[in-house]
Amino acid sequence: MSNRDAVDGGDTAGAFAGRDGDETGDAEAGALAVVCGLPGVGKTTVAERIAAHVDGDILRTDVIRKELFEDPDYSDAETEAVYAELIDRARERAADGDAVVLDATFADARFRADVREMGERVADSFDLVAVECDESVVERRIERRDGISDADFDVYLHFKDVFDRIETDHVTVDNSGEEAETFAQVDAAFGGPPSLDG
């Protein structure tokens, strides 16, 4: 699953090539997929579908933040700590041979660069998936969702202003339509529907 047919952004020649050129040659490493995008666009929906493809666990910054901070203030220092912990956990899991999917905004290009460097060095394969969604759909979904995320529509608008453009190879999934349409895009990028064998 390390080579993708549908890639958006940048030069695709080396996209999703896995660890073929990595000097460690650790065939036991697990796959790493990163799902990024603005709050409310449907990252978790996409992450869950990818996890079914790679038979992996999902790590979410929303969960990690609340594990690390009893009363999160979303400061820059807190965000740095959350992403450092996210990447450390992903590194450990991939190195141990477990597939892992990261579900996080990754608005800051520095964090995306850090996780890409780690993934290309440690994981069996690395995929960056950017989730997009029409703004009107995001607003409706945020109004009715009830989950662990604290993000409301004002948070979405804030991140829309500060989200660093993705300049590296990645797959884009448009989650504006029905779930089946979103799943079809993920399946196309990951080689067909996921196995139901478990």
Residue ranges and their predicted role:
Residues 1-33, 39-48, 68, 179-198:
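Haloarchaeal acidic low-complexity proteome signature biased toward cell-envelope/secretome components but also
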Residues 45-98:
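Conserved substrate/cofactor phosphate-moiety recognition/catalytic segment
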Residues 49-53, 114-122, 189:
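Alpha-helical structural signal in soluble globular domains
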Residues 67, 135-142, 180-183:
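Switch/connector loops and helix/strand junctions flanking conserved nucleotide-binding motifs
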Residues 72-77, 144-150:
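Short glycine-enriched, charge-decorated loop/helix-capping segments at active-site entrances
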Residues 78-127:
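Glycine-rich phosphate-binding loop used to anchor ATP phosphates in small-molecule kinases
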Residues 122-142, 173:
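Conserved phosphate-donor/acceptor-positioning beta-strand/loop module used by diverse small-molecule
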Residues 147-187, 192-198:
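Small-molecule kinase domains that catalyze NTP-dependent phosphoryl transfer to phosphate-bearing small molecules
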